[in-house]
Amino acid sequence: RHSDTPQIDTPHARRRVSLVDYEFADLIDDQDKVRLLIDPTSSYAQAAAYAMGRAMDDEIISAAIGTAFTGETGSTSTANANQIVHGSAGLTIAKLRTAKQTLDLNSVDPSIPRHIIVGPKQITDLLGTTEVTSSDFNTVKALANGEINQFLGFNFIVSNRLSLDGTTRSCIAYAQDGIALGVGKDVTARIDERADKGYATQVYYCASFGATRMEEDKVVEVQCTES
């Protein structure tokens, strides 16, 4: 009775996120508005928003398989240890199963959503390496057609932003909380006239954000050959 309260020291560490400032500005002359059938302002604003989205994608992809910084001062570098060597093949079902197994062996909670970022070529590879008689064929075909976006427990995200080293494309399989995006300043948009530019309309977007890999056990690099 009345024993001491047990003290449990849960191991933890901090990760450093270096914020990067992004700006986008473009001018639309009044003459352009006259020459075009529609007001181009909304198209320019949409292009700026897409540019900011691509910048966020690049930060996340770079952080996923790059060097993470941890420790009290954020100066200790940590490399990603989970890497599936590509051999001489593109993306195969065997590689997807290995990525899933890697996360499972690392005791990643299966209730946490899992994603995999691949390129268009990897979807084609999956379809080409799956036999028509295989039970996986119809699922992969539906994936290639965009009818579904999930296979083997992964939500598929198709991107052209993945790095290519020679003929090797680095795809990324990860649990959702394995990568964090830090936003210092959310996306701000302004559309104003510039008196100093002949009263041209300026579309301006800015933001400040960065990303880091939170846990190595929750991120797997899947290397795929592209010929």
Located regions from the model:
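Long, contiguous amphipathic alpha-helices that act as assembly "spine/axial" helices in icosahedral shell
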Residues: 11-72, 104-120, 156, 189-213
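Sequence/fold signature of self-assembling virion shell proteins
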Residues: 3-6, 10-18, 35, 84-91, ...
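Generic structural signal of hydrophobic/aromatic residues within well-ordered alpha-helices
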Residues: 60-64, 99, 123-126, 222
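Generic signal for short, ordered secondary-structure residues
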Residues: 26-27, 78, 182
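Extended, solvent-exposed, turn-rich assembly/linker loops in the middle of proteins
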Residues: 70-142
